[in-house]
Amino acid sequence: MVKVIASSVRKGNVLDVDGKLYVVLTAQNFHPGKGTPVTQVDMRRIVDGVKVSERWRTTEQVERAFVEDVNFQYLYEDGEGFHFMNPATYDQVVVSAETMGDQKAYLQEGMTCILSIHEGVPLALELPRHVTLEIVETEPVVKGQTASSSYKPAMLSNGIRTSVPPHIDAGTRVVIATEDNSYVERAKD
């Protein structure tokens, strides 16, 4: 365990709070005009999946658990969960749907992800920053819309809704940011 200041806690970190391990879902630093700055952290308890919200002064010490980040390749999903393989050792691990959370929509066969492992147990998954998906449905462009900062709703092949520029039509492959589901660019493939 390593002690760190609360303001350095980031999404995906594993914290030891009162002897229990938690995965950080969100971490935000607030600096009110009056008073001391605080860090608001939403976490999920690893043992039972209970979500907890904590607020610490930014200078408070919290314990970060030792977690090994290892590259794994996504293989497939079945009734047990999501199967990943370590390309260096060919070891396979199964990650539960609860651990995956909303990120499972972006998984593609053969995709390389980073799994955070603590004592042999996968705790969290980090996807690539960008993924390429196909647009399956968009609304038609309204006449008179200009190209400047006007976006239209679109449905991606993984079922997630996003906003795309007016020149993007159904069937177009686009690059999407996995962190916030936002359009990045048209795919170059």
UniProtKB/Swiss-Prot annotation:
Pfam families: EFP, EFP_N, Elong-fact-P_C
Pathway listed: Protein biosynthesis; polypeptide chain elongation
GO terms for MF: translation elongation factor activity
Subcellular location: Cytoplasm
Keyword vocabulary terms for this entry: Cytoplasm, Elongation factor, Protein biosynthesis
GO cellular component, one term: cytoplasm
Cleavable signal peptide: none
Example GO BP: peptide biosynthetic process
Keyword Cytoplasm carried by entry: yes
InterPro entries named in the record: Elong-fact-P_C (IPR015365), NA-bd_OB-fold (IPR012340), Rib_uL2_dom2 (IPR014722), Transl_elong_fac_P/YeiP (IPR020599), Transl_elong_KOW-like (IPR013185), Transl_elong_P/YeiP_cen (IPR001059), Transl_elong_P/YeiP_CS (IPR013852), Transl_elongation_fac_P (IPR011768)
Family the UniProt entry places it in: Belongs to the elongation factor P family.
Function according to Swiss-Prot or TrEMBL: Involved in peptide bond synthesis. Stimulates efficient translation and peptide-bond synthesis on native or reconstituted 70S ribosomes in vitro. Probably functions indirectly by altering the affinity of the ribosome for aminoacyl-tRNA, thus increasing their reactivity as acceptors for peptidyl transferase.
Protein name stated in the entry: Elongation factor P
Species this protein is from: Rhizobium etli (strain ATCC 51251 / DSM 11541 / JCM 21823 / NBRC 15573 / CFN 42)
